[in-house]
Amino acid sequence: MVKRMAEHNNMKKAVQQIMLGTVTGKHEQTLKVLNRIKASGYDGLELNRYMIHPTPMFVRMLTRIAGMPTGNGGRLNWHELIKVSGLSVISLHTDLGSLEKEMDAIIEEAKSFHTDKIVITGMYGFDYSDEKEIDSLIMRLNKAGKTLKESGLSLLYHNHNAELTCVDSGMRMYDILLRETEPEYVNFEFDSYWFADAGADPCRWMQTLGTRMKLWHVTDRGIRYSKKAMTPILKADSMELGTGNLELEKMKEIAEINGVEAVVLESHKNWINKDPMQSIELSGKWLKKTFKTYE
């Protein structure tokens, strides 16, 4: 009889769509990319609304300058591409303002992709140190989460490093977010890379989140040595899983204890050979080795 692993080892493995902006311009090219992702052991994608709808050239130019090119894939039929590739959609990323203005349309779009998770990508033009702004954000998140729950969906908040800003009370913004949002309506997609980038211990925060951590954004962090160093201080950046210095094995154990539903690979720069697909495939090898399942 084939031995079965514990249920918590059956975490889905996915790729964040932001990694695909430079390789998903045309239908056939994109289908080949998705097939390679599937063949590398991934179960699904995490889609971004701004990448599955046409966006102005100015917006695409700004994202490229920022190091996160969204590409020209917004004109493609992503429903067909997902179906043919055999991948699933883990969640749908959007911004809070769009969700509030287009709630019904976004709910229907999520359901059309057979996902029950809407993720807020973080706040822009926002003072992370101001308690009044944070209180307003919490009210908005709770309200949006309640509406989504009534439609059978759930709301998650995705962090970067700004959430570790200390506010007027001396607490970190993320502390207040955890304390004041309603677990019934608001939960979290935890990005361990960004908290490590800010000097925090991702493992401690994952333990603090507990079962409110529904999805895990992951990439490794380290130094890609390419030439003789002029000084002993080199720049650390995102790396393929298992090639950097983060305690990914320990994080994986905590994610399993928390009952995390999916681990989502995301890096938007410093890819091996500057190739996102090679990066995805290399990280996929680590994921397959680490998240073993038996049927």
Give the ranges of each region predicted by the language model.
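N-terminal pre-domain/capping segments
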Residues: 2-117, 187, 285-295
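Conserved beta-strand positions
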Residues: 15, 47, 92, 120, ...
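Tryptophan-centric aromatic hotspots in well-structured domains and transmembrane helices
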Residues: 18-20, 42, 93, 157-158, ...
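Acidic-and-aromatic substrate-binding clefts and catalytic sites of carbohydrate-active enzymes
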Residues: 20-28, 47-73, 94-103, 125-135, ...
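Acidic/histidine-rich catalytic cores of soluble enzymes
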Residues: 45, 148-245
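Active-site acidic/histidine proton-transfer and metal-coordination neighborhood
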Residues: 75, 88-187, 277
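H/E-rich (His + Asp/Glu) clusters that bind or coordinate divalent metals
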Residues: 244, 251-252, 262-266
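Aromatic-rich peripheral "rim/lid" segments of glycoside hydrolase catalytic domains that contact
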Residues: 269-295
